[in-house]
């Protein structure tokens, strides 16, 4: 007996290795087809300001974009935003911006808003936003420089300049939330939806 009952693999509208690893480890077969969208432009035009709302919109837009090119397929979109108080962070453009973000986050608590949306034929079948709370320890400029030297260009791949599944874990005093939520794809609500659709045997 197999775990997955779908007629075709799930389509993941993301090139994130962390999200792909989460699905692989959960035994969910998938095909990764990234959505080519101007995420910042979509968020700006939307007029939304709440981090969770922006993440939800972008997850839905990614899934809908890929769904339009792959009719009949079940498409999963995901997005994550970082909020420090009322301020939302974007992925740093370069090392200097990553260092600036880390200096702002150091010694403070921020939130990660992770959203997923499941779409078929342009229709959203399921959507969820889950929050994780992260407490970064105080960091000196020297520690930030050492960290950025170690991680290299990957600092620009994630909002906040860190990847907690790697060396980024050294930056934290406290982490409150589901591991998959922190990595940008809340698995538990996704698995619950897939079970409700009779797509899983477990």
Swiss-Prot record:
GO terms for cellular component: cytoplasm. Its EC number is 3.6.1.9. Its cofactor is a divalent metal cation. Keywords: Cytoplasm, Hydrolase, Nucleotide metabolism. It comes from the Bacteria. One of its GO terms (molecular function) is nucleoside triphosphate diphosphatase activity. SUPFAM superfamilies: ITPase-like. It catalyses: a ribonucleoside 5'-triphosphate + H2O = a ribonucleoside 5'-phosphate + diphosphate + H(+); a 2'-deoxyribonucleoside 5'-triphosphate + H2O = a 2'-deoxyribonucleoside 5'-phosphate + diphosphate + H(+). Gene3D superfamilies: 3.90.950.10. GO terms for biological process: nucleotide metabolic process. Nucleoside triphosphate pyrophosphatase. May have a dual role in cell division arrest and in preventing the incorporation of modified nucleotides into cellular nucleic acids. Belongs to the Maf family. This is Nucleoside triphosphate pyrophosphatase. It comes from Rhodopseudomonas palustris (strain BisB5).
């Amino acid at each position: 007996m197999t775990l997955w009952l779908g007629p075709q693999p799930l389509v993941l509208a993301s090139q994130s290795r962390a999200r792909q690893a989460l699905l692989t480890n959960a035994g969910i077969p998938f095909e990764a087809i990234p959505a080519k969208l101007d995420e910042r432009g979509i968020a700006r035009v939307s007029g939304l300001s709440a981090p969770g709302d922006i993440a939800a919109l972008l997850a839905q837009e990614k899934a809908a974009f890929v769904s339009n090119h792959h009719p009949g397929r079940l498409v999963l979109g995901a997005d994550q935003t970082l909020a420090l108080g009322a301020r939302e962070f974007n992925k740093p453009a370069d090392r200097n911006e990553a260092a600036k973000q880390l200096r702002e986050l150091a010694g403070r608590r921020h939130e990660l808003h992770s959203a997923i949306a499941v779409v078929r034929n342009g229709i959203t079948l399921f959507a969820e936003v889950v929050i994780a709370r992260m407490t970064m320890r105080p960091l000196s400029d020297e520690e930030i420089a050492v960290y950025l030297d170690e991680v290299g260009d990957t600092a620009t791949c994630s909002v906040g300049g860190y990847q907690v599944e790697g060396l980024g874990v050294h930056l934290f005093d406290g982490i409150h939330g589901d591991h998959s939520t922190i990595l940008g794809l809340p698995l538990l609500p996704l698995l619950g939806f897939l079970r409700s659709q009779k797509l899983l045997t477990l």
